């Protein structure tokens, strides 16, 4: 019991997973663009990855984003998070993402393209697909995001056992 108290007070080194680095991100996006799957699925997956990476979003934050939480501004996009693990008092928080010079890796451009192609105008922006490429009304789960990221890492040839979602 005393040791646990000391550990909590002093802290201990975490043996966490590695973060995805920019070179991995580019590999993943390049591979997604080459994939032989429906355009709408490619665009959803690349948007999840670019928004997640660009804004440092947790999986649960990504899947909680609704259309009503998005505000496109001249500089990029503001995304309101109603709840977050880091928002201890439940006040909500706004994350801003700027436009990137290179559109291919720009989370804002990808988000705009996703919303246009998916025709989402309300509710969750990251939804599940039914058989084929039919978008459902159901929000993705955080586990779905894990599977999408791991699959993309695998296809990109990046060893995925050392990575985990935020």
Positions of PLM-derived features:
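Extended, non-catalytic subsegments within catalytic or DNA/protein-binding/adaptor domains
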Residues: 1-166
């Amino acid at each position: 019991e005393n040791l646990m108290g000391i550990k909590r007070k002093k802290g201990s080194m975490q043996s966490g997973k590695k973060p995805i680095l920019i070179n991995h991100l580019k590999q993943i996006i390049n591979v997604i663009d080459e994939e032989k799957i429906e355009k709408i699925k490619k665009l959803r997956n690349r948007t999840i990855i670019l928004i997640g990476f660009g804004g440092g979003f947790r999986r649960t934050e990504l899947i909680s984003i609704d259309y009503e939480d998005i505000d496109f501004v001249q500089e990029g996009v503001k995304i309101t998070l109603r709840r977050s693990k880091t928002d201890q008092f439940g006040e909500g928080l706004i994350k801003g993402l700027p436009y990137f010079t290179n559109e291919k890796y720009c989370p804002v451009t990808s988000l705009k393209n996703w919303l246009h192609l998916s025709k989402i105008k309300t509710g969750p922006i990251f939804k599940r697909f039914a058989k084929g490429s039919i978008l459902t009304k159901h929000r993705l789960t955080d586990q779905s995001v894990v599977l999408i990221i791991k699959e993309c890492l695998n296809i990109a040839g990046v060893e995925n056992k050392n990575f985990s979602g935020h």
